[in-house]
Amino acid sequence: MERTFLMVKPDGVQRGLIGEVITRFERRGFKMVASRFEKLPDARVMEHYAEHVQKPFFPGLKAYITSGPCFLMVWEGKDIVKISRDMIGATNPAGAAPGTIRGDYALEIGMNVIHGSDSVETANREIAIHFKPEELVSYTRIDEQYLYE
């Protein structure tokens, strides 16, 4: 089964949206295999956003991500990377469709509630940055027989 990394960012945490995010993914049939609530250290933010460190917007992004706690999660399911990106919506909330997390809850591109891995490769890298292998829990949902052919 495919895995992805999701993170409810500080604005989503402060606005009480963790439960909403979890509910949407559970109802879709995906299962959470790891989670942690923490304020991210600078070094890990720089590792996570390594491709953006030299960009002019990075200092603001780093200040925002470290401004409060985040809720980090690893989810598992068939085609979860693509489907989760569709559920999250466009990075810029102005272009995010209604019914997506960002379309329903985000107002600014800089504070857009949630991060989700954009490819299987990125998901594997981000999961390894934030979680040790032994922190990922393997289990079978009772309804899996009704979710997958």
UniProtKB/Swiss-Prot annotation:
Binding site for ATP: K9, F57, R85, T91, R102, N112
Free-text function comment from the UniProt entry: Major role in the synthesis of nucleoside triphosphates other than ATP. The ATP gamma phosphate is transferred to the NDP beta phosphate via a ping-pong mechanism, using a phosphorylated active-site intermediate.
GO cellular component, as recorded: cytoplasm
Active site: residue positions: H115
Protein's organism: Methanospirillum hungatei JF-1 (strain ATCC 27890 / DSM 864 / NBRC 100397 / JF-1)
EC number assigned by the record: 2.7.4.6
Protein known as: Nucleoside diphosphate kinase
A GO BP entry: CTP biosynthetic process
Catalysed transformations (reactions): a 2'-deoxyribonucleoside 5'-diphosphate + ATP = a 2'-deoxyribonucleoside 5'-triphosphate + ADP; a ribonucleoside 5'-diphosphate + ATP = a ribonucleoside 5'-triphosphate + ADP
Alphabetical list of SMART domains matching this protein: NDK
UniProt cross-references to InterPro entries, sorted A to Z: NDK-like_dom (IPR034907), NDK-like_dom_sf (IPR036850), Nucleoside_diP_kinase (IPR001564), Nucleoside_diP_kinase_AS (IPR023005)
Keywords attached to this entry: ATP-binding, Cytoplasm, Kinase, Magnesium, Metal-binding, Nucleotide metabolism, Nucleotide-binding, Phosphoprotein, Transferase
Pfam families assigned: NDK (PF00334)
